[in-house]
Amino acid sequence: QIKNSGFNMLRVHVHVDLPVFYELCDELGLGIMHDSEYNWMHPVDEAFADRFIHIYLETVDMLKKHPSLFCWICMNEPGNLTLNPTPDMDRADCDAMKVSPGPKLFAAVCEHDPSRPVIKGSFCVNDPDSGDSHNYTGSLDGADGHYSDIYGTTEKMNTEFGFDAPPCIDDLKKMPPVYRRLQPILENLDSIGQYQYYLLKYFIEHYRMQKYKPNAGYVQFLFNDMCPQTFYGIYDYWGLPKKGLQAVLESNMPIGIFLKFKDKLDAIYAVNDYSYPLGTCQVGYSITDETGKVVAEDVKSIVIAEDSLTKLWDFDGTIHSGNVYNVALWIEQDGKLLARNEYHDVFYMPEHTPGHPVHMSHETGCRIYWA
């Protein structure tokens, strides 16, 4: 399911999985970024550092035989509970990164496995030994902005983004305590699911349209719900898909065609993530208004190279929010459809759903749905 959803890598987050998981990733060619068990905040004394380094090096020894594993992550969001970054202070300024266990842990892992890159502190964007980003704009930070606020921003490599949408009512009823707790928002489950779709689609396409400029990759959090009361997956705990899966299937395939927009249409891009060129292809777009009248359209031939990002069209800003527009995009070759994408009422960009909580509990690691 992971590979069929267009992903070629994943992140094992703050745990060690079953041996068969790593064997399957080897066979399927799915790359793995692998965390330690360090999450948010732990003691900074030397005794803890020595014990933790010993534990993580055992993990490295156990897993480094797997060719799918391409990166170690020493700590996840260090200082998350003790440091609020400001323009003058970075997450990397926390004690975990500067004092303990970060410096010794990073050095030990680099020495223990010099064949792979090592991230010292995931989410320490400006740290030269880290650099990856986490972005929950419009999600965990839903009360403070909109997911489209990412427009115009760049990230070198994103290793966390996503949105938590509860599963369908029938599945929630399988866990009565969870079902009872969510009573106040049951009528909003469909709109919350739709919001997951819109947010994921916008984020994925945002990253893909900055391929190597500067973005080198992204990791959606999570693929499946790890327990009945956490909802970040695009599959629920019982294995049923949510609306977010549709966004992944539309926007996450190796060959894609995408529209850059916010308040107006900006440009159309083609992306080829394969290591071979597609050659000469026919690309096209059609923009219609709410009556179905064609407002703009074009078709042309273009050569699409291997592992590439290609700008296909620029727009002049005359098509903007305030009216309903539907957009269809496609890539064809010799009569075969290679990729397509659609945006129904393209400027409809829903707000964070009322009733969906904005409070995140760092004790439980999930949102608090008040009874």
Where are these regions (language model features)?
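Intrinsically disordered, low-complexity Pro/Gly/Ser/Thr-rich segments with frequent PxxP/GP/PP motifs
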Residues: 289-324
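Buried hydrophobic-core signal for structured, non-transmembrane domains
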Residues: 53, 57, 266-272, 314, ...
